[in-house]
Amino acid sequence: KELRERLSGDVDDHLLHGAVRFGTERTMEQDPTFSFRIVVDIALKALSPAINDPTTAVQAIDQIEDLLRRLGAHDLDAGYGYDGDSVLRLIFPMPAWEDYLVLAFDEIRHYGADSVQVVRRLRSALVGLTNSVTDDTRIGAVQRYLKQLDLTVDRSILTADDQETARQEDRQGLGL
């Protein structure tokens, strides 16, 4: 049949509801950015002045790094939806690698800029990603983000000694 004929006509509600999920909440299975958002929110709450718990923020960064390492092994081009006959029916945009880096680290970098512990763990996560991601474009994005982290340290209220320490990666985020 012609494409126009196949795409015209009434929509079977039963088939539509079987193909598309409707709900009031985002899920990790349907929206990969949601997983990052949850963990980033944990880190941000830990970094808030009322809580002031950089260790919890570091633990959140551990999880974010793990998510990014796993994601780095996957193709992040457009998403494709096929019908039961393997006919392409839907193409939908997916976040790019840089979008995930921004989501994962921007707010933590901003709100954790004055914590040597947090900055060192962020640096370690980024260096770890440059070693685990194989795509040159993605490695370049991580290296650009490392430069952004250096600029953040330069503008922070940390003392010169603390800034020097913050430029050294620390996998455990001890801040020493």
Please identify what each model-predicted range represents.
Residues 3-176:
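Short basic (Lys/Arg) and small-residue
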